[in-house]
Amino acid sequence: MSSKLRLGVAGPVGSGKTALVQALCRRLRDRLQLAVVTNDIYTQEDAQFLTRSGALEPERIRGVETGGCPHTAIREDCSINRAAVSELEHQFPGLDLVMVESGGDNLAASFSPELVDLCIYVIDVAAGDKIPRKGGPGITRSDLLVINKIDLASFVGADLGVMEQDTLRMRRNRPWCFTNLRTEEGLDRVEEFVLQQIPN
């Protein structure tokens, strides 16, 4: 039996993908049936982090070692991820949401529609305020763009106003939000978005 929603979470290394998955698990686990698949190139570091932090029960988390380019495992040949998702859906019938976190990648990363229904793309302010205007599928076509680490703007000389203007121009009417996932600022917007996507 398939889950109600398969949600991809992508973005560059260190942008806050795992922090977002962890925060959503904590917010939603008492209301929804959840599972997570994480991707790392040579380790299962993100899966182990989620397990250690108690985001979900260990059996609801699968770590995939891609062994190569991160976007290949979520786009060109996503069979290893599809197998992990199917395994979770078989083990836990009635899942509401399976989150698939990609390995850290560049702005060209995108998920295969065979793997996920929707994608959240995470970037961070520390990479500079020019990132939104650089474009790429994650910036322009993701279902939700999350601009994380807004608390670091003053330390790296990033202008949130510039980022907002560029994001509005690049995304037109597609949703996006600023977050500081360490304090959960802006997380309500992400949670609301996810809940709206899950079929009744």
Curated annotation (Swiss-Prot):
Entry keywords, A to Z: Chaperone, Cytoplasm, GTP-binding, Nickel insertion, Nucleotide-binding
Gene Ontology BP terms: urea catabolic process
A cellular component term, taken from the record's GO annotations: cytoplasm
InterPro entries (alphabetical): CobW/HypB/UreG_nucleotide-bd, P-loop_NTPase, UreG
Single GO term (MF): GTPase activity
This protein's record includes keyword Transcription regulation: no
Subcellular location: Cytoplasm
Amino acids binding GTP: 11-18
Pfam families hit by this protein: cobW (PF02492)
Subunit structure and binding partners: Homodimer. UreD, UreF and UreG form a complex that acts as a GTP-hydrolysis-dependent molecular chaperone, activating the urease apoprotein by helping to assemble the nickel containing metallocenter of UreC. The UreE protein probably delivers the nickel.
Functional description taken from the UniProt entry: Facilitates the functional incorporation of the urease nickel metallocenter. This process requires GTP hydrolysis, probably effectuated by UreG.
Family: Belongs to the SIMIBI class G3E GTPase family. UreG subfamily.
Name by which UniProt lists this protein: Urease accessory protein UreG
Organism: Synechococcus sp. (strain CC9311)
Upper lineage: Bacteria, Bacillati, Cyanobacteriota, Cyanophyceae, Synechococcales
Gene (name only): ureG
